[in-house]
Swiss-Prot record:
Region (Framework-2): 55-68
Positions of the UniProt region annotated as Complementarity-determining-2: 69-85
Sorted UniProt keywords: Adaptive immunity, Disulfide bond, Immunity, Immunoglobulin, Signal
GO biological process, one term: immunoglobulin mediated immune response
Protein name: Ig heavy chain V region 102
Residue numbers spanned by region Complementarity-determining-1: 50-54
Framework-1: annotated segments: 20-49
Gene Ontology cellular component list: extracellular region; immunoglobulin complex
Other known facts: This germline gene belongs to a set of closely related genes that could encode V regions of NPb antibodies.
Organism field: Mus musculus (Mouse)
PANTHER family named among the record's database cross-references: IMMUNOGLOBULIN HEAVY CHAIN
Length: 117
């Protein structure tokens, strides 16, 4: 069996807060099936601990799927049942960065992932 990989495209978006809000994500990740990946979303231009951070998935030709959200003030999380056990959301308040770890990656995880407030 040949070598295969999974491509995760990462995009950040901010809506309805302030025009100077920025969410920065790396452009893409290339990982092997079965592996895990931890992706980041660095926030600036607003009070990081005041807003829920949401994560969303979009596969080619499909609609948006809400993965879950985390509140940076206390790390309270809510997950879409479908992504429980697949995604783990965390934050680092000191760097205003949110993280999403995806485990046991398969071809179904190849998608664009958005962080959003």
């Amino acid at each position: 069996m040949g070598w295969s990989c999974i491509i995760l495209f990462l995009v950040a978006t901010a809506t309805g807060v302030h025009s100077h809000v920025q969410l920065q994500q790396p452009g893409a990740e290339l990982v092997k099936p079965g592996a895990s990946v931890k992706v980041s979303c660095k926030a600036s231009g607003y009070t990081f601990t005041s807003y829920w951070m949401h994560w969303v998935k979009q596969r080619p030709g499909q609609g948006l799927e809400w993965i879950g959200r985390i509140h940076p003030s206390d790390s309270d999380t809510n997950y879409n049942q479908k992504f429980k056990g697949k995604a783990t959301l965390t934050v680092d308040k000191s760097s205003s960065t949110a993280y999403m770890q995806l485990s046991s990656l398969t071809s179904e995880d190849s998608a664009v992932y958005y962080c959003a407030i």
